[in-house]
Amino acid sequence: MKQYNRIKAAHPDTILLFRVGDFYETFGSDAIIASKVLGIILTKRGNGSASEIELSGFPHHSLDTYLPKLVRAGHKVAVCDQLEDPKQAKGIVKRGVTELVTPGVVMHDQVLESKENHYLASLHYTPKGIGAAFLDISTGEFLAAEGSVEWIDRLLRSLSPKEWVLQKQYELDLISLFGDDVPRSKLDDWIFTEAFAEEKLHGLFGIKSLKGFGLNDAPKATVAAGVILQYLEYTHHTNLGHLQGVKRLRETDGMWLDRFTVRNLEIIYPSHPDGVALADCLDFTKTPMGARTLRKWLVMPLTDRENIEARHEAVAT
């Protein structure tokens, strides 16, 4: 178990799926969680011995069935594979984490909803306001904003991110402001700096200035965007060629609805399991992209007459 313990220690906040032969196995508290979420048998390894530990697992070919269930339940999952042919191995087979899937960073079709965006959000807390960034890695849409607590709260409720990335020391502050109903990941303080964020953004997009993204006067939004990129690196998602840039969101872009309005009017989700949301009633779109766009329009009605008329003209044609 030394190899397992070493890899688990490097990913303590995940459920570690540890490849052993033809199975992915989980141990200890991970096994207890996996057994409950997946409905698989929980047993013990080393029954009756001092090293007894809980164990549960499933065949490796069932990964695409079981992994989405763990992620939908709000868990981060580290997939640890065998990195060499067991028949050629001298001693213990080399293993390593090949994929880290979190509620907000997922590319599996079994998890993604085609008609909804699947955002990862990062939040940068300061006494003078909050920065936020939102990335749907499946589509490449990358958004950033900064402003008051009320404004960021409206964004969070409108865009409904699946996971938040926070600064460790401000976790309780952000929970008190925005609630405790979304899975969270915490990163070290040194990542939440403007210089680090600019370096990450300049490097990814091959630019020398953030002015083209509208972030040159938005330090808190810039930090939040940089945090997103660092988190993607942490989760082994480095193939980001489909990201074309960052779009800055401004409070004047439209009428961003608060959480109570979105919930009480059942705009995106119905109040009851058998109910129907407004979005479902209006959705006659032909593509997943159109369905996602419609939902964003519903939670952010336009307020500028010229833009409203332009949208009406586009729909009419």
Label each residue range with its predicted role:
Residues 1-317:
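Charged catalytic and DNA/RNA-contacting regions of genome-maintenance
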